[in-house]
């Protein structure tokens, strides 16, 4: 984590960007890693834990390869966390629904953080332009 943070700080100082941009860049990196891990968890739960038809069976994904399942699960995770949530894939078992609740909470928090960071970047940029 420390090396990634140093990398973001070096990038920010090289590009003459503020701390808000560094935080936002680090946040995007963490969000992408989170989508990967939750996507893998979503596959694991769909294939192993279930008291009935999982999202894999209910969506007709039984014959998909592991890479196709990874793509579908990462798509689901990304659309849920970014609050787009098309609804074409959803949790059907209790465990899957609990994971969806967790993803919804992460989505609200990440959306709020991203909005605040972008507002800070724009405000700092505007104040820097006013000084020049």
Describe the predicted segments one by one.
Residues 1-2, 22-39, 60-131:
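Pore domain of cation channels
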Residues 1, 7-20:
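A conserved hydrophobic secondary-structure block that centers on an alpha-helix together
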